[in-house]
Amino acid sequence: MPLHKSAEKRLRQAARRNERNRARKKELKGLLKNMQKLIDANAAKSEVESAYRAAVQKLDRLGVKRYIHANKASRKKAQLTKMLNSYTPQA
């Protein structure tokens, strides 16, 4: 347990930030899974493209604000782009 008031405050702040960071990362994970699920379900190309745009937008935002490392955001965007470009819906 913290011995000083300032340490108690830092503990509270860290807990709030941790919760916010976890929520943002969980949201990103959901967007990435959604795109993969659409690809696996053989969805229309337009649906996959809209999921791609949402995921890339979230990756950009989290990378700029340093919730994830910028290189990780870039790497994930490249992987998603590769998946999107190679995707052709089966009739």
Swiss-Prot record:
GO molecular function: small ribosomal subunit rRNA binding; structural constituent of ribosome
Gene Ontology biological process terms, A to Z: translation
Region (Disordered): 1-24
Biased composition (Basic and acidic residues): 1-21
Domain of life the protein comes from: Bacteria
Family to which this protein belongs: Belongs to the bacterial ribosomal protein bS20 family.
Protein name: Small ribosomal subunit protein bS20
Protein's organism: Chlorobaculum parvum (strain DSM 263 / NCIMB 8327)
